[in-house]
Amino acid sequence: MTHWFHRNPLKATAPVSFNYYGVVTGPSASKICNDLRSSRARLLELFTDLSCNPEMMKNAADSYFSLLQGFINSLDESTQESKLRYIQNFKWTDTLQGQVPSAQQDAVFELISMGFNVALWHTKYASRLAGKENITEDEAKEVHRSLKIAAGIFKHLKESHIPKLITPAEKGRDLESRLIEAYVIQCQAEAQEVTIARAIELKHAPGLIAALAYETANFYQKADHTLSSLEPAYSAKWRKYLHLKMCFYTAYAYCYHGETLLASDKCGEAIRSLQEAEKLYAKAEALCKEYGETKGPGPTVKPSGHLFFRKLGNLVKNTLEKCQRENGFIYFQKIPTEAPQLELKANYGLVEPIPFEFPPTSAQWTPETLAAFDLTKRPKDDSTKPKPEEEVKPVKEPDIKPQKDTGCYIS
């Protein structure tokens, strides 16, 4: 599915040295600081490494997060926070407002922001894998799984960690509830697209495909609605994508619902359902053009050029013509003026996020190691704060060249 999924840019961050001169008083504390620095740098490198796979990402993320936990949680597993939580200032950009970074002197902010990027990496990995010329069944399962993992990470951040921030997220920033919720829903919707493609490939009952398409369209509508109160200057492009996907999958739902109605000898209603599918497909085509002309973060994808998109247009046209022929020869039923109400509920194939937890605190953290950080020796002019003029360079993401479109479904 090359050029099928819209992706916002990765978050960028200022370098962190983890050098605490005077504060670090022993070799074990010094080693932890060195390991934090190197594991953070390694994780940031992997975000743009095309050879990285989910196992490599998990290992690198766990390595960094388990060390970072010592800056957040107390070692005795009480509710008390670590004395080091506020020792370091972290600076991150946002996916929609990438040029203007946010900074917080809080290790929880770092945990959330880096976790957010790990989730984004999973969505980009899924998109890249889905764009392969001849995708295998195992690869399709990996696309499906990666999107569910991403949804689980976003959900966990929203429910368990963002509420712990001392400084609440500013409006329109990634950690604000509207944005992170939109990311959760989009991941679920895109994973369900894989399910729909699989159901079509295996020729499942039209009623099931219609219900899955309708549920997926509702996901996209919900995500779009979640972003509706954001500033259009940075949300318009993303919203166009969500809107066009909503129209596309509603058209799918009406198309397959029409087949179900025809099989039940309700030919007049089937024709009206397919007419609605035709109208929504045309609207999705128009929205594809508008999406391409809308400025905003992220590269522009081209869904209307994808064979999966065009195949629906042909399917709607052929099924409508078939229904009209049947009605002219056999049924002679009146065509309703109103489109049928879609009250479809899928009993199978609905996507739930894969639950996510950060790794426990690294075994390198011991009471002796923690004691080797002496905050009373911290310099008064705190050098851990980034200088005001320090620039956060955007992440240079690799260009993904679209491969030849074979029209293969993700199966």
UniProtKB/Swiss-Prot annotation:
The keyword DNA damage does not apply. One of its GO terms (cellular component) is nuclear membrane. Residues 409-411 form a propeptide. GO terms for biological process: mitotic nuclear membrane reassembly. A lipid is attached at C408 (S-farnesyl cysteine). It is found in: Nucleus membrane. CDD domains: BRO1_Brox_like (cd09243). It is a lipid-anchor. PROSITE patterns: BRO1. Farnesylation is required for nuclear envelope localization. The keyword Nucleus applies. It holds the Pfam family BRO1. Residues 375-404 have a biased composition (Basic and acidic residues). Residues 90-408 form the BRO1 domain. The modification Cysteine methyl ester is found at C408. Keywords: Acetylation, Lipoprotein, Membrane, Methylation, Nucleus, Prenylation. SMART domains: BRO1. The modification N6-acetyllysine is found at K283. Residues 374-411 are annotated as: Disordered. Belongs to the BROX family. Monomer. Interacts with CHMP4B. Interacts with CHMP5: this interaction allows the recruitment of BROX to cellular membranes. Interacts with SYN2; this interaction promotes SYN2 ubiquitination and facilitates the relaxation of mechanical stress imposed by compressive actin fibers at the rupture site. Nuclear envelope-associated factor that is involved in the nuclear envelope ruptures during interphase (NERDI) repair, where it is locally recruited by CHMP5 and reduces cytoskeletal stress through its action on SYN2 to help reseal the ruptured membrane. This is BRO1 domain-containing protein BROX. It comes from Pongo abelii. The gene is BROX.
